[in-house]
């Protein structure tokens, strides 16, 4: 099998724990792109916030290179940040998700992602540091009133941050009980976030939509990730790859598990094995 596109999660996959990029990953990505390969960050973040990373990878402003943002809520071409597709939350549903989540604990902070902006309510100290390390632009807000929801740009997702797994599970339960599990896609990420998108919006379906637009079969697509919000794209891809630091559920889903973790060039390992050296999946 000849692979033509690699979709990659960012945090705890492509990026080191401190938010930087291993130079092995940078070199391998640039080498693959130089051969006509497509490297697509597939992230929960906004496409605006990944622009510094795209510059490091040599992808910023490139025609026929893409970013999938908001866990599949938007597909954007790097040239001119041309938005090809958005799949937004209904404003009323977004408001209900927010209200349900913050009721669980007074220490919870909440992120509201619109197509162009990130708003954060009750910003925590740990989240402030996390955002700073990754140069993610955001705007702090007070409690959002009805006008906020009705006048906002299209809302891509609502997420909640808390360091305790038990609290994150409570948030998940509270939101799903309130709005109904059929109304949203609910996932965990980065061992700190609980994320809610519109039903049917996840990284896997977005990968399929992009592949269709590019005339690719999913058998020609590789995907790599570490956490539960990556499961759908690993399942959808022709070759699903887990980094060594991935959670057990991801490792079980993946076709192959890398030797290296995110801090030691797992993405480069995958590219060198399956793209740059022309090794196909028959050797797994």
Where are these regions (language model features)?
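Short, hydrophobic/glycine-enriched beta-strand segments
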Residues: 4-9, 40-41
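Active-site phosphate-binding/coordination module
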Residues: 23-128
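Short, well-ordered alpha-helix to beta-strand connector turns
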Residues: 3, 36, 64, 155-156, ...
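Short, structured coil segments at secondary-structure junctions
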Residues: 57, 63, 71, 180-182, ...
